[in-house]
Amino acid sequence: MAKYYVIGKVSKELLHRMQKDPTADRFISTQKVIEAVGGKMISYEWVRGRFDVMCCVEGDAETVVGMKVAFLNSGLMDELMIHEVIDYNKAFGKAADAAKSVVKPAE
């Protein structure tokens, strides 16, 4: 399974709901959504900065996109970014192979 980092900005609606119920377990509710689409949540953290929430999810691309659509359509999130974890050694190895085939004009 591929691993993805999902970084999100919560909506004002969710902020209001959490202020009314600060002990609500967002980990469990988030985990249920991810499992409903066939994914597995590895970690879930609230962070300071431009975004509010970061979680690590295992699954395929369709699973993670399905989760994203469900959260955005719920109105609880304003923005979600998906970042797939890659093997950078393989990626740069392929870049090195491809570079051997690059032909610049007029050379």
Outline where the language-model segments fall.
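A compositional/biophysical signature of low hydrophobicity enriched in polar/charged and small residues
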Residues: 1-107
